[in-house]
Structure formats: C-alpha cells, structure tokens
Regions:
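Glycine/threonine-rich beta-strand-loop-alpha-helix active-site module
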Residues: 75-127
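ATP/NTP phosphate-donor binding region
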Residues: 1-91
Length: 127
C-alpha cells in the first residue's frame, strides 16, 4: 500500500509522517531558528542519515553526528551532552530505534537543564 497523503499531528510534540517528509526538516528547524544539530543515529553511514544531513547543510545548518550503537549507558548519554554543549548545538534529531531516540531526548534535556544523568536518575533532581 503506497502512502500518497501524509499527515501531521501536533500535541506537546510534533509528529509528521509520510513519504519524503524528511525534506521538511530544514524548514521546521529554521522556523524554530535552529542552526546547529546534534544528529543522533545508529550509524552515520545510513543513506537516510546522509540524505537528511545534506538537506540540513544545504539549508545552511551545521550537523554534528553522534552514534549510539547500543542500549545507551550513563556514559554514552553524558558524552553526548558534552559534545552538544562543546559544539554549541541548539537541537537534537534522532534517526534510529528506541535507544537512539531515547538517547537524543535525554541528551537534549541535559543540555538545556544541566547536570548529568545520575543527577536525575539516582539523586532525584527534577526536570
């Protein structure tokens, strides 16, 4: 079954689904005035990663790849946060499965709210 029409759902998060919808990513990030993306993925060698990265760089945005190849550990998350901050990123994008998506969400949260993973997981720091 071919998907001929896409759809968009907006709750507290935005979900966009449909064929070739990745071409809308630069416009969405531009609307939010984002300039430098920490792009979390399983592999920077994925064709989809390369396509989206090209779309972003063609739109004048910088892309910092970050690979998450396993279930993310505290060290993987905190290292991603360190790269996000050191590189001056202002948003995350995730391409991959649950581990990649979860890692990108936590990296972004830590970059904005400060601290490390253990502060929230072990010491009860509120978001």
């Amino acid at each position: 079954m071919a998907i001929t029409n896409g759809f968009e759902m907006v709750f507290n998060r935005r979900l966009i689904f449909g064929e070739n919808k990745v071409t809308e990513i630069p416009g969405i990030l531009n609307w939010y005035n984002k300039k430098k993306v920490l792009f979390v993925t399983f592999s920077a060698e994925f064709d989809a990663f390369k396509k989206i990265s090209s779309l972003l760089t063609d739109a004048g945005m910088a892309v910092v790849p970050y690979e998450v190849k396993t279930e993310p550990t505290l060290q993987i998350i905190d290292h991603g946060r360190d790269i996000y901050v050191a590189e001056g990123c202002d948003c995350t994008i995730a391409l991959g499965g649950g581990s990649v998506v979860d890692a990108a969400k936590v990296i972004g949260m830590l970059a904005v709210n400060g601290g490390d993973t253990e502060d929230y997981q072990m010491r009860g720091k509120a978001v």
